[in-house]
Amino acid sequence: MADHPAYIELKGICKSFGPVVANHNINLSVEKGEIHALLGENGSGKSTLMNMLSGIYSPDAGEIYLDGKAVSFSEPAESIKAGIGMVHQHFKLVDVLSAKENIVAGKEKAGFFIKQKQLTEEIRAIEEKYGLIVDPDKKVYNMSVSEKQTVEILKVLYRGANILILDEPTAVLTPQEITKLFD
């Protein structure tokens, strides 16, 4: 048994929607650096569980711990502030904006004007760190599905996520795009 708390710990998590029980008494521990996959049939509660961790839903019962401290998120902005980023199965990108514009949209920055060169450098640093490369000036409507997925991942990393939740990351990808995404 470890002498330190798990980085993420879910204890006794329950969530219902009316009479439908989505999660009942779920326990999960994740250490730093670990990769976990939740497998189950459609409607088995996987996305609901991750939506609670990312602040979209609140559990009806149970507790969530992050690095040993109890946390409660009432909205996604709170979970991203805590370092949890979620990439959803259905992209949340603006088609007429570039990759760079989508990555930084909604991110609070000091000052009124955002320096484009600085943004490009910040995004490039994240791309190089994680090996996720995308043309920052390419419009989303001209991107492949895997490029859009990459932009979504870069978006949460740009916001400071150190916990990355991918909800069905390969559901809309071709076999070639899956290989590229996880390469």
Q: In which residue ranges do the predicted regions lie?
A:
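Glycine-rich phosphate-binding loops of nucleotide-dependent enzymes
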Residues: A2-D183
